[in-house]
Amino acid sequence: MNPKKPKVRLWSVLTALTAILTIAAIVGNMIANQYATTLNVALNASTYKIIKGNTTEDTEYFKAGFASDEEREAYEAELCATVEAEGAALLKNDNAALPLADSAKVSLFGHGSVDLMYGGTGSGSVDTSKAPNLKEALEAQGIQVNQTLWDLYKSDSMMKNYSRITPASISDTLEANTQYAVNEAPWSALSSAESSFAEYGDAAIVVFSRSGGEGADLPSGTNGTNDSWISGSEGSGNYLELSAEEIELLKNLKALKDNGTFKSIVVLINSSNALEMDFLNPAICGEDYGIDAAMWIGDVGQTGINGVGQLLAGTVTPSGSLVDTYLYDNLANPAMYNFYTQAYPNAAEYNLLTEGADVQGMYSVYQEGIYLGYRYFETRYEDVVMGTAKAGDYDWATTVAYPFGYGDSYTTFAYSNFNVTESDDAFTVTLKVTNTGKTYSGKETVQVYFQSPYTDYDKANGIEKAAAELCGFAKTDVLAPGASEDVTITVKKSELRTYDANNAKTYILDAGDYYFTAATDSHNAVNNILAAKGYTVAGTNGRMTEDGDASLVWKWTNEALDATTYAASANGTAITNLFDESDPNKSSDAPGSVTWMSRSDWTGTVPTQPAALTAKETLAADLAFTQYDGTEADSVEMPTLGAKNGLTLASMIGKDFDDPQWETLLDQLTFDEMVNTITLGFHNTAAAASIGKTATKDENGPQGLTAALTGGASAMCYTSEDVMAATFNVDLINEVGKCIGEDCLAMGYSGLYGPGINMHRTAYSGRNFEYYAEDPFVAGTICAAEVQGIQSKGVYVYLKHVALNDSETSRRGVNTWLNEQTAREIYLEVADKAITDGGAWCVMTGFNRWGATWCGANANLLNGFLREELGMRGMCITDFSGSSQYMDLVDGLIAGSDIWDSPMPKIHTTKAANYENDAYIVTQMRNAMHHILYTVVNSNAMNGWSASDTLKTVLPWWQTAIYALIAVLAVLTVLCAWQLSKALKRKKELADTAPAVDQK
């Protein structure tokens, strides 16, 4: 009988396989640990457990307002539709084309009709896979929709060949702009459905959609800085003009309207980026496309399209007002020449990076100054009407299609009994609003504007003044035909202040005449003020577009220049220049001088090409990634670490920021706990066992709670922020905020990366959908209302991105240059209102630099402006910082940054270890922890916690699983190796005892 052959080959293979798997698991664990923060957030994995103390107190500090998720979701679905219905702006309604007749039969055209823009892309994107579509929204109102045409647009071939193209990833590079394309279907592709048009001919409803998103600005074609970015049928490369196929569509619909197939043509503008409006005006574009009605609807959110259906059917009357100036040619905006970033021509000489995650050698200049949007178009218009010297060749009527604040209605309204009274710190505006129509009920938005004097002092000291500035607004209730409502609007006197950056170096109130007016839009406001000054259309040879109403104007005179009343903030902090280093005409790094745009010389200062700057040695030095040199290391005593004082974070509930007990609590923190919390703040704040601090979860976003980056839960997607602002309804958006807070509370989130507070500097910013408006007053007022609502549920907001992150191209480190008046009056004003009026807890700083200094390392911005002037007590988080060295840990801590939005320890956590013995940096870490902990202890993260509860750190379940897998594989490897050893030994024994082979 032959002995059993040992299985050497089998055990060799199994030993090698298990050894390889063991090594792979170990390496995988090492990689996973690098991304532990991200995995914990995405997998909802806890790193601690709570040890409950003995208490009977109610620890539900922030309570839900809904009895069930179903109740909350149903309410929010209606709320989102209401926001859209109140925010959409009716632009044109000839021949009473809208509302549609009962049971009207309509055909929907344009790829956008079946593929709406619900929101943008990037970190603010939301899941709208189950959102209703336009067809469903219309059918819910009894409108019948052409099924044949709908099915054609929805067919696989049409969706494959003619879908909107958006940049696929967040790249931040100029080249990303080339990826945008409208890609509308040509008219010939609709031929198979043409026989169905007549039956559904009550209206042809055309949807023009444009996408935007994080990491890529929209292409504008030739703009003085670059050539066409889109070729072929897309036309000039301007993404916001109609494409050749869209124009072809309109031409063919006009022909069908002319032959009686369609009764009317209605256009819906589904975009947060302002399209060029020339196609709505035959005198401008040179062709009549027969468009009867047009409505701007922005990005509609999850259920907002239902609100559009209500508007089209007449269930609701439009009452929204534009929050951007809509132009015939977007390149008429002076900001366009400096919108896309430029490279310093000598960047290579100083080894300045011009692309990637650490940009140094790219810059942008806000040369237009305060003249953003209507502040330019209406101010230059007034100067032309008044015959002011150097106003130049400017024609408002051929430049502006629809002014800021414009919004039509199905009914008409009249204003009367206008009156203004003055008190110590405010003006109270009252007037009567009457629905003068005979058929439709509706709401009216009342806007109050002021004009401040443009004085010789201003001209001598480089102060700029707009012809009109929004300073108050209100929305009536629904008024039936013939009904009236008395409206009261309070205007703070501080709205009249202006910043004098060159002489007084603080806010001043100029001497002279101030005008207040109630108006329907910014242009109407200027015409009213011109009327009060005695100007008429006839008297200006037609330079004035229409006569204003002087009865809606009130004049107030300030007898003497006042440089003291507004020279201190509400908390008593002296206000003076903080941002000279961002002004190329003042900065010690000055890369060249800039001529700011000025109404004193429009012809000589309106840009005709990008501002030219050149890098120099001092600028290059200040663009280095780390500025701190360690000389302050021993300037302070090393803080106490790891003390056993017995306090927990919950014991600080209700304590003031300056309560001395905070020092006792902070003494308990360990160095590792501080580093972990500060450097790994990606969508969370970490647990800290020494003080019983729970971990918190933070999430995007601007349109409501989302989880675009972590794949977690998402909730109601509201409309884009511009639609929210266009409601001009503070109470409504406060309710939106409360519901966003409810979503966070229900899903376990304590922080929200939003609202977005950057400005619509041009129509081409990729993230305009995340930001409210071109005007800081309406943006700040609406934002403050939303913030109040969100935070009422214990959710701390991070206003993003403070500040000047108004474009996407080269955003990671771009050098942004502007003067202080512009910074304060335009780009910081939203944060000011959101913090002082809305009580916003936190901010997220921008990727960009102020001059040479990264936002997160700008002490004057974070500590000087936000904390000292405005009194903000919460934390400052960076934008995503996992791969950027310029978002430096130590420089940021010194300047007031508290937490880095980073999921990996590669850069910042590793760097922090080098400063364990640097008392100055450890002190900055302690200060940062104070801001973080003060925020968290006042949030819903403390729900369920009492002062007697403690916390114990544990391994997250996924880490335990990996360790278990490694252990199992290691044991299997050992067993297989043992079996292999036995097999080899047996093989040798068999070889030794085998009979000798005959060698004959």
Where on the chain are the PLM-derived regions?
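Glycoside hydrolase catalytic-domain context in secreted enzymes
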Residues: M1-Y499, I508-T517, S522, A570-K1000
